[in-house]
Amino acid sequence: MSETELEKIKVRTAEHLENDKNNISWLKEDTQLTNAKHADEKPINAIVINSVSDFNITDGPAKENPNEKKLSESSTSLSSLEECQTTFSYLQTDTSVHHRDTDEECASLILACLFCQFWDCLLMLPGTCETVCTKMCCPSRRYHHTSDENHSRNDCSCNCDMDCSLFESCHETSECLELAMEISEICYR
């Protein structure tokens, strides 16, 4: 097909669409109902989302670009903030949802520390602590052996000679409780 034939088809399709809009009564009624339903509503010029719990609709002027359609000319508008929140379920005003996860994580961390479960506590902390302890216990993981010698399959000898007061503190309840409180203070910041 040539370009002129494609243009003729596009023009005919557009003409048929316009004729259908003018001749089909239910299409006219639907357009009128839609316009009548939203006639009293104010069009949205800008939507500003500062955070999940903070959602503002502003009526400030939008930047105009001659190639773009003005947002105020658009037929899209929201009747209320509630409608928007039901449409976009991630816009919740209830901030307690986000605090619950942090509270549960901190409680688990404190309990692991109080019951002297050091490795559970270590795995709950960010990955950097685990990496530091792994590097101290298994120094062979820090570098790749380049020699041609045959190494045993068990590459990690794990000489865990860590002089860490955390292991000693775990046997004293008051020290462990103090450590747990410091950890929870960090979690709640």
Swiss-Prot record:
Family: Belongs to the MDFI family.
Biological process annotations from GO: negative regulation of DNA-templated transcription; regulation of JNK cascade; regulation of Wnt signaling pathway
PANTHER family: MYOD FAMILY INHIBITOR, MYOD FAMILY INHIBITOR DOMAIN-CONTAINING PROTEIN 2
Domain named MDFI: residues: 28-188
Underlying gene: MDFIC2
One Pfam family cited in the UniProt record for this chain: MDFI
Disulfide bridge partners, by residue number: none
GO cellular component terms given for this protein: nucleus
InterPro entries xrefs: MDFI/MDFIC
Name used for this protein in its record: MyoD family inhibitor domain-containing protein 2
